Every structure is written in structure tokens, then in C-alpha cells.
Regions:
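Histidine-centered active-site/metal-ligand motif
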Residues: 18-21, 309-310, 332
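The catalytic Nudix box helix
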Residues: 61, 253-292
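N-terminal strand-loop-strand
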Residues: 207-253
Length: 334
């Protein structure tokens, strides 16, 4: 096998993996001895925008390939870092560097600590990028890799958007012609799962919510602010389970919508006490404040204002809600 590059990198969410995505991976297989797919938005709770786990997305892509091509595909989850792009870039680079290290060993490239970066330079890496819209700007953020542009359109010359396919999927429209047959089979099977049933209910809830006449005729898109309290004690965090959509059944921070007549901190304390029935005074909670942060990533479901608090070590003896070790939260999503 004599390919132009040692590694061809493809970055995407693939929710779901559709026909143009397959063309993208096909091109990567033409260019690289080894293809590394970085599956974005990894380890998040499922919602109608990101319904599939990394494992399921991997299965969708693998189902489309066989033999040697399938063996050449390598999959890694890549978590979003919307408030720290440098960290996101570093994580992607570190994943690829591990593959570069393997190839250095395979090729018996000798190096010392001083010449290590020169050795890395002998491993040819390309990013196969699909510049679909303004969300694809990241493909220009890896100058150390050669950028191989991919221009994929449908036979009619249109851009195929996974957002439209998800809409068809949750509204029971025909989408099968837009995805590889193997993916269509997996998506059909997924419809029988409880996860799909819950997501479809959430999709319908959100669609109806957005269609509310109070917002349809507004001169500007409505922005809904919420205040959520992060209450920490002895390495544990206080969580509540959502009883309604969106996110019914998921663990969440206690909080709610910001009332127009309340300060942010007052609203956070009010919601915390109402949702958890915590037997700690508002004054004590206010005095326990360690800081707050605004999370305004525009692709969040809503614009959230998260107020962070920390109680004394005995703070949880009065709680009637679930507390979890912070360290355990890292392993709950796959």
C-alpha cells in the first residue's frame, strides 16, 4: 500500500453518518495509509441534536466498510471545549500524536529528545476537511497538518445537512435515501430503543415550545436565561433528576429560568431551595458563594447562567437529593 499520507484525519459529529460523510471517509481512505476519525461532541447526554453515542456512531461508520478498509479506520471521541478552543485543539493534536508515535516505531525512525519533533515531521499527516459552513472554520486551525479539501454535494448539487436528516428521523419522514443502506438499518433498529422514544418526545416538546405564539411573532429570537447552582461538598456535587422535558430522566444541576424581577444570585438560591428542599438558609447560601460563570455558547439549548457555590463540610447532612462524587461523573457518559 502506497498512499500519499501516513495518516488521514477526519473530524466530524456524524449524527447520523450520511452519504456525503461516506464520500469524505472514502477520500480519506484514498489518501492515508491509516484513517483516524475524531468523533466530536463525545460524552454528552443524548438530545435531539446529538442523539448518538461515540460507540453507535463508530458502528454506523464501520458498517459501511469491510476487509482491509475497515481495519484501516481508527476511532476516537473528541469532547467539545466551546469555552477553551486551545484545549480542544491540543486534545485533537495529542490524539493524532499517539498515532504518529506508533508510526515512528513501525518505521524504525531513530530520534532523541532533541530530535523528536523532527521525527514527527517524517510522519505525513493530512486533515481531510469539508468546508460546509461557518462551523467548519476549525479545519484551518491545524497548520502542522496538510489540508486536503473535500467538496461533497448531492447529485443535485445540494449540500446534505445532518440537521435535516435528524428532523426527518424524528418526524417519521423518509430519510433512507440520504444515508448508506447499512446506516439505514442501524437507524431503523435504534427506533425500537427507549432512548429513541425519549428523544422523539423531547424533539416534539421542543418543536412545540418554539412554535408558541408568544415567541413566533417576536421581533428578535427569544433568549431564555437560567440560573443553576453548583453546590459542592467534600468532592461531591448535588444533582436533581429532571422530571420533564427537555432532558427528562437525566441528572441535572438544580436551577430554573431567571425571573425578570430577581437578581441572578437570588434566583439561583430560590431555585436551589425550591427544587432540593435544602434546609440551609438563603443567607448562609449567599455567604457560601465562591463565584459564578456565564455559559453563553450559542448552540446550547438555552443560554445558561451558572452560579457556583460551596458549602461547609457538613452541608449535605440536610439534603434530600442525590449527591454524586465529582470523579464518578467522568465515567457516566460514553
Amino acid at each position: 500500500m502506497n498512499k500519499k499520507y501516513d495518516i488521514a484525519v477526519v473530524i466530524g459529529r456524524f449524527e447520523p453518518f450520511h452519504n456525503i460523510h461516506k464520500q469524505l471517509v472514502d477520500k480519506a481512505l484514498e489518501l492515508g495509509e491509516k484513517v483516524v476519525l475524531l468523533l466530536g461532541t463525545a460524552k454528552v447526554a443524548p438530545d435531539p441534536k446529538n442523539p448518538f453515542t461515540v460507540d453507535f456512531r463508530t458502528a454506523m461508520i464501520q458498517s459501511c466498510y469491510h476487509g482491509e478498509d475497515r481495519k484501516r479506520l481508527n476511532f476516537n471521541g473528541l469532547r467539545d471545549k466551546p469555552y477553551n478552543e486551545a484545549l480542544w485543539l491540543a486534545e485533537a493534536q495529542n490524539i493524532i500524536r499517539e498515532y504518529q508515535d506508533d508510526i515512528i516505531i513501525e518505521k524504525n525512525i531513530e530520534y532523541t529528545d532533541v530530535t523528536y519533533h523532527a521525527a514527527l515531521g517524517q510522519v505525513k499527516v493530512a486533515l481531510v476537511g469539508y468546508e460546509k459552513d461557518n462551523t467548519s472554520y476549525y479545519i484551518h486551525k491545524f497548520p502542522q497538518w496538510t489540508l486536503e479539501h473535500f467538496n461533497g454535494n448531492t447529485p443535485e448539487g445540494k449540500v446534505l445537512n445532518a440537521t435535516d436528516i435528524r428532523k426527518m428521523y424524528f418526524e417519521d419522514d423518509r430519510y433512507e435515501h440520504l444515508v448508506p443502506p447499512e446506516v439505514g438499518t442501524l437507524l431503523h433498529s435504534f427506533k425500537s430503543t427507549q432512548t429513541y422514544i425519549d428523544l422523539k418526545q423531547e424533539y416534539s416538546f421542543t418543536k412545540q415550545y418554539k412554535a408558541d405564539t408568544r415567541f413566533v411573532n417576536a421581533p428578535y429570537d427569544p433568549i431564555f436565561n437560567t440560573t443553576d447552582a453548583v453546590l459542592v461538598c467534600n468532592g461531591h456535587v448535588l444533582l436533581v433528576k429532571r422530571g420533564f422535558n427537555p432532558g427528562r430522566g437525566l441528572w441535572a444541576l438544580p436551577g430554573g429560568f431567571l425571573q425578570s424581577d430577581l437578581w441572578i444570585l437570588d434566583n439561583a438560591i430560590k431555585e436551589l431551595r425550591e427544587e432540593t428542599k435544602i434546609k440551609v438558609s438563603s443567607e448562609r447560601l449567599r455567604n457560601s458563594l465562591k463565584g459564578f460563570h456565564v455559559f453563553e455558547y450559542p448552540y446550547r439549548s438555552f443560554r445558561d447562567v451558572v452560579v457556583m457555590m460551596r458549602l461547609e463540610q457538613d452541608g449535605f447532612q440536610y439534603l434530600h437529593c442525590q449527591i454524586m462524587k465529582i470523579s464518578s461523573l467522568k465515567t457516566t457518559l460514553k
